[in-house]
Amino acid sequence: MKAHIQDKTKLVNSVFNKVYKKYDFMNDLMSLGVHRSWKKNMIDWMKPQSNQNLLDVASGTGDLAKIFSLKNNNKNEIICVEPNKYMLETGKAKLNSFKNIKWKLAAAEKLPFKNDSFDFYTIGYGIRNVTNIHLCLKEAFRVLKPGGRFMCLEFSKIENEILNGLYKQYSKVIPLIGKYIVGNSAPYDYLVASIEKFYDQKQLANLM
């Protein structure tokens, strides 16, 4: 079990070591920009108040943190947690003007924060990549304040057979796009495989 965890940690880290320079561009290209609408819709639905703080885990380049911050004119206290140092530095540079956003290099399974610290916990397209989802969820609810909200945005299996068939065809193209843009198809082979192997919506909800 320990060897499996170490292997996945190493694999995921190597994936982001390869893609961090083109991460935002590839997200826009692969989703035709739709991922930005999904993120905005989630934050809009949360309706954060200016006195509420946020922990954004597996933050990537900080899209969710930025949208959250702009909802209240950058008055919220926000901490972005990112396990990959290159992704963290990219996100930190991108959001350098947001003085209310702090960055921390840490894993979702071992958060360096006290119990009952945050009003919101967000994780966008990151929970597939954690090495121990049970520990990740345990840590999430540990650091949330009583009544705090856990918000997860993630890819999952498509129940509609026609749409699922179209996605399966498109998923074959994703690694080819990655090879052309990033120079390496392996990270996008991992992306496609991780979505296919991940829990469906009901299974993930049951874990919580």
Model-identified regions with their sequence ranges:
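A generic alpha-to-beta junction signature in SAM-dependent methyltransferases
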Residues: 46-48, 72, 95, 144
